[in-house]
């Protein structure tokens, strides 16, 4: 079983066992214990610090998603992003997240996020849809950042 499949199973298990918020926190701990994931997070952290001014605080938005079995529930991503954008603007800090699809990327761009790193994830483990495939090319993901004054203070 690949680490991606293990990761997805672990995420589903933790979210059903602990609820989405605590499940995401537990998942982050699970992720950071894996050596390959540590390198993944290290590379993203390095890029964040290249872009943002030295010492700038930021909120890391992790595991934003929607339950596909309830398509009638709308606006949850908007509520999350608007709440954290307001908090970040008041505190003069940034928001950071990763988009794992073109659709997610376009949603985040609508809310003012910009892409600062494009990377492949899951090469040799999953295909472009995230399905297990030992010859898979992985999928494209995007490190995205937001700050109310990004155009003047971020270093592209």
UniProtKB/Swiss-Prot annotation:
Sections of the chain in a coiled coil: none
Keywords, sorted A to Z: Membrane, Transmembrane, Transmembrane helix
Location(s) in or outside the cell: Membrane
PANTHER family noted in UniProt: ACETYLTRANSFERASE, ACETYLTRANSFERASE (GNAT) FAMILY PROTEIN
Gene designation per UniProt: IRC11
GO biological process: mitotic recombination
Outcome of gene disruption: Displays increased levels of spontaneous RAD52 foci in proliferating diploid cells.
Keyword Transmembrane helix: yes
Organism from which the protein derives: Saccharomyces cerevisiae (strain ATCC 204508 / S288c) (Baker's yeast)
A GO cellular-component term linked to this record: membrane
Membrane-spanning parts: 20-42
Protein's name according to its UniProt entry: Putative increased recombination centers protein 11
